Amino acid sequence: WLHRNLLGGGERLRLGAEIMGIGGTTGGTDYELTLAFSRPATFGSDTDFFTNAVISSLNEPNFSSDRVSIEAGVHRYATPEREYSLGVGYTAANTMDTFGTRSYRILTLPLSAEFDYRDDDLNATKGYYAKASLTPFLNLRGTTNGARGFIDTRAYRSLGADKRMTFAVRGQLGFVAGPSLRNAPADLLFYSGGGGTVRGHNYQSLGVDQGNWNTIGGASFIGLSGEVRVKTGEKLSVVGFYDTGFVGSKVVPRNRSGNWHSGAGLGVRYDTGIGPIRFDVAAPVG
């Protein structure tokens, strides 16, 4: 539910509820309730104030988490292509993984920068996109002080005057610094596998192996993807892609501290005019 003019000044209030993973073969059912409020032009014409609250229950393949988080901050639109945000937040969670049941409470200072120079954010054929986020956190209970960082970059290049062939690449890099894996919040660590990381592998199938079929999340993550899209008609395209991912036990990714896996596949894209619909088939290749 969305109200676009709550107080008469363009304020937006969004209430959301989501259920995920129904009938899935990995993990369980996830639930999430969200409340988000934003007020435009609060600190100048290009700077909005925002606040949000999220209540979630996650039942993932290797951990579960019941979490409440609140955040408030500012979002600045520097140009149509560049955005920045700064906030302060609080998170309380109860988690369960290989190390048992734990709870933590942290204060957070989330920072982000986003650059979008694509010709179309839903069906890009040229340009690039990058988003970097850094969230230092202060321990109140159950963990230690630290920070979580994540970078997502994408680039696109097309050939020919009619742009019938498009090359797309993506790189992701993440880390959790400060607490050890045993003391780190389980829902802040990294896994790889499934859509968004390495297609062809089960969701979150790669983490840090603890032996006896037990896996936890990693302190570092690398994701690399490449694909080629070829138009076969005005609306239809075929796609070939290759993904690889790494999860490590150390903040600085090193081969000896973790493992890689890869997947490849083919897909079909149909352009609806408001965005593409896509169907992929992938398999592990390493």
Write out the residue ranges for each language-model feature:
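Acidic/polar loop patches that form or flank catalytic/metal-binding clefts of enzymes
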Residues: R12-L13, R164-V169, I277-D280
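Gram-negative/organellar outer-membrane beta-barrel architecture
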Residues: L2-K131, V198-G200, Q204-T215, A219, ...
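Flexible, small/polar- and glycine-enriched "cap/hinge" segments at structural transition points
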Residues: D46, Y77, Y84, D243-G245, ...
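C-terminal beta-signal and terminal closure region of outer-membrane beta-barrel proteins
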Residues: P253-G286
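C-terminal outer-membrane beta-barrel translocator/porin domains of Gram-negative envelope proteins
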Residues: L2, A92, M96-R102, I106-K235, ...
